[in-house]
């Protein structure tokens, strides 16, 4: 899977740009503020319907326009697909895949699986469980078609249950919702657990490449004690949940725990090692996606030279190339990337003040 053409219009500081990326590694370079990260952001927006830099999507639309337009040709198993997205300042979104109107943004994510490695993505290990649940759920969504609806049902029921808790209704009025919550929670949890088990198998060898002297143990916690019946737990904790006004246990509290020995990785590893661990997690996800669905992810790697030293930069780039995936990497100076590659990039693009120029014959400096 790879993007063969990308059209960007009125997105951030890019008024109009068209790129024909290569199948392998695409290097995008330019000074800070030139617009190189905006290209990665546009690809992400096309696959997810939102930005990885801001939760306010309207901010990515140029101030003198009322909409942005993104379009791409996508090659999948030698077949061409077309994806188009238009986002208006009022929040409305139009999405088309091969000319058909698409109602659900999840269809975009299914069509264009994207992995992101940016300075912000290293917060996966430092922030709360939410970001790690999202990491698990990316894989669960792609590995099992029933996950998306089951998780949507969990969130819908939790919203209803929490409102009833705030209204301090009797447990008999909540009992029906608890039965439904248990049903879908068990489905979500089983899919998540199976996914993490499969991810662990992929992860072992990759962590060995990045952190050869470190043994990292990865475990999944479901959001309640696995030895406890979830339905009974909801009833037992009812008064506590009423006092809190929300549901204290469930799949919305799940987490991915990573340890070295008995210590959390945050306490056992240096910041540089933690960055390598996040890279290993992202690569493992991409390899598992390929194994389970025969689809490659598209990797977006922002500002790589500032995050890793030359040795580990070379290792990461080699690991990315070994996945067979299409990769987009940004840097201020092209030499920082070119000198870390065994072969030249598939394509190079220079960005200056929102204008993109293709460099036809990338060479080492």
From Swiss-Prot:
Keywords: ATP-binding, Cytoplasm, DNA damage, DNA repair, DNA replication, DNA-binding, Nucleotide-binding, SOS response. Its main location: cytoplasm. Gene3D superfamilies: P-loop containing nucleotide triphosphate hydrolases, RecF/RecN/SMC, N-terminal domain. GO terms for biological process: DNA replication; DNA synthesis involved in DNA repair; double-strand break repair; SOS response. Coiled coil: none annotated. ATP binds at residues 30-37. GO terms for molecular function: ATP binding; single-stranded DNA binding. The keyword ATP-binding applies. GO terms for cellular component: cytoplasm. It is found in: Cytoplasm. It holds the Pfam family SMC_N. NCBIfam families: recf. The RecF protein is involved in DNA metabolism; it is required for DNA replication and normal SOS inducibility. RecF binds preferentially to single-stranded, linear DNA. It also seems to bind ATP. Belongs to the RecF family. This is DNA replication and repair protein RecF. It comes from Shewanella halifaxensis (strain HAW-EB4). The lineage of its organism: Bacteria, Pseudomonadati, Pseudomonadota, Gammaproteobacteria, Alteromonadales. The gene is recF.
């Amino acid at each position: 899977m790879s993007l063969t053409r990308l059209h960007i219009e009125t997105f951030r500081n890019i008024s109009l740009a068209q790129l024909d990326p290569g199948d392998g590694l695409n290097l995008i370079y330019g000074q800070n503020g030139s617009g190189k990260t905006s290209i990665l952001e546009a690809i992400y927006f096309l696959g997810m319907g939102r930005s990885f830099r801001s939760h306010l999507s309207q901010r990515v639309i140029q101030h003198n326009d009322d909409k942005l337009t993104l379009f791409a040709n996508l090659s999948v198993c030698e077949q061409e697909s077309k994806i188009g997205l238009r986002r208006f300042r009022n929040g409305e979104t139009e999405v088309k895949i091969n000319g058909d109107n698409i109602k659900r943004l999840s269809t975009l994510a299914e069509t264009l699986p994207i992995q992101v490695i940016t300075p912000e993505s290293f917060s996966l290990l430092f922030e709360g469980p939410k970001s790690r649940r999202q990491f698990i759920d990316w894989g669960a969504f792609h590995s099992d078609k029933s996950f998306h609806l089951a998780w949507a049902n969990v969130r819908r029921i939790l919203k209803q249950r929490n409102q009833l808790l705030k209204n301090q209704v009797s447990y008999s009025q909540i009992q029906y919702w608890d039965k439904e919550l248990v049903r879908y929670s068990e489905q979500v949890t089983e899919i998540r657990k199976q996914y993490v088990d499969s991810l662990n198998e992929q992860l072992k060898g990759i962590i060995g490449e990045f952190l050869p002297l470190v043994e990292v143990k990865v475990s999944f916690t479901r959001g309640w004690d696995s030895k406890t019946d979830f339905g009974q737990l909801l009833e037992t904790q009812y008064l506590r949940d009423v006092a809190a006004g929300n549901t204290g246990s469930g799949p919305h509290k799940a987490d991915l725990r990573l340890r070295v020995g008995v210590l959390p990785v945050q306490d056992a590893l240096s910041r540089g090692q933690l960055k390598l661990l996040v890279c290993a997690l992202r690569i493992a996800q991409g390899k598992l996606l390929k194994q389970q669905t025969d689809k490659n992810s598209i990797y977006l790697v922002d500002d790589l030279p500032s995050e890793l030293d030359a040795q580990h930069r070379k290792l990461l780039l080699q690991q990315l190339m070994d996945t067979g995936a299409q990769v987009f990497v940004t840097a201020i100076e092209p030499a920082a990337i070119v000198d870390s590659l065994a072969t030249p990039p598939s394509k190079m693009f220079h960005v200056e003040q929102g204008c993109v120029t293709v460099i036809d014959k990338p060479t080492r400096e």
